[in-house]
């Protein structure tokens, strides 16, 4: 009898999607603040609609930041250069409403900068998750990896002119058929590929489908996962000319599953973009990913999830949880002990160990195409940490 398989789907959106535009603006602001003042406290939100981008939130920094320039440069870099593609970076209205961080929060979290790193408290309460699986070289879920890479490839062929008819906005979705191998996930085949991409007026649906198959799907999805039964939905709505902020409103922090594991694992609900590393929504999720990835990379489990939780103003985590989904080579309680001994979950120490105070052109890179599974030295939380522990004598 054939083994039971199941279908699992993950989606992604391009850098030109309105919500992702907002994530990138928020992280561009964070980068600019950290580049001049590594101790900047940043909680920057962005929203957008037709012909308008607004940045708002709480920022305490010694940096001199030209918010309007950051907004326009970010929009232009994505490709929003005229109204007909969804936004004109040079002519749109830019609104700024930034205040300082509440002094109540400041004294509770970092004692107005008087605390040592190990004493710095969490910027808020919350719980975060990290996940890893041995089904791909990135130790990420295949459905998420493929959906994300299709979106990145759409942008690549738009910007290099291979598919000149493409416009910045777009969405992808991949359904993978999986086998459950005693708790580990084994991809069998790609069941369905869905791409909806913004395009100009001149291109036909047949041209869109042919170009997407040849220049986007073929280079991204390995042949071994495609067969004659694979279903393709390529711009199934038939027309997608109006896009970007003209088509939909956008807001920071509305694509948190795309940012993480594509629906696998779990999510504590906190978004990442526009937040400095004292915000454990971000730093806690990053260290939890490094812990889960290191467990899988070390061979202690084929699949692993790590949860960590915090109270505002308290440095030590309230709880740390590990589940290997039955794939552990040793009991989960022993894996948990190894995680606690090898990773420092205090916010001030996570910031140092992952070098999270460094801005520049760093966090904006995380704000499109996922925060995890990326090969880039700036993604320090993706570095597998060699685990020190007592190996049981056989």
UniProtKB/Swiss-Prot annotation:
Binding site for ATP: 17, 169-171, 237-240, 248, 254-255, 271, 275, 279
Residues where Mg(2+) binds: 11
Reaction catalyzed: L-methionine + ATP + H2O = S-adenosyl-L-methionine + phosphate + diphosphate
Gene Ontology CC terms, in alphabetical order: cytosol
InterPro entries the UniProt entry points to: ADOMET_SYNTHASE_CS (IPR022631), S-AdoMet_synt_C (IPR022630), S-AdoMet_synt_central (IPR022629), S-AdoMet_synt_N (IPR022628), S-AdoMet_synthetase (IPR002133), S-AdoMet_synthetase_sfam (IPR022636)
Chain sites annotated for binding K(+): 45
Domain of life: Eukaryota
Annotated L-methionine binding sites: 58, 101, 248, 279
Cell location: Cytoplasm
Chief localization: cytoplasm
GO MF, one annotated term: metal ion binding
Subunit comment: Homotetramer.
Record function comment: Catalyzes the formation of S-adenosylmethionine from methionine and ATP. The reaction comprises two steps that are both catalyzed by the same enzyme: formation of S-adenosylmethionine (AdoMet) and triphosphate, and subsequent hydrolysis of the triphosphate.
Protein name: S-adenosylmethionine synthase 2
Organism from which the protein derives: Oryza sativa subsp. japonica (Rice)
Phylogenetic placement of the source organism: Eukaryota, Viridiplantae, Streptophyta, Embryophyta, Tracheophyta
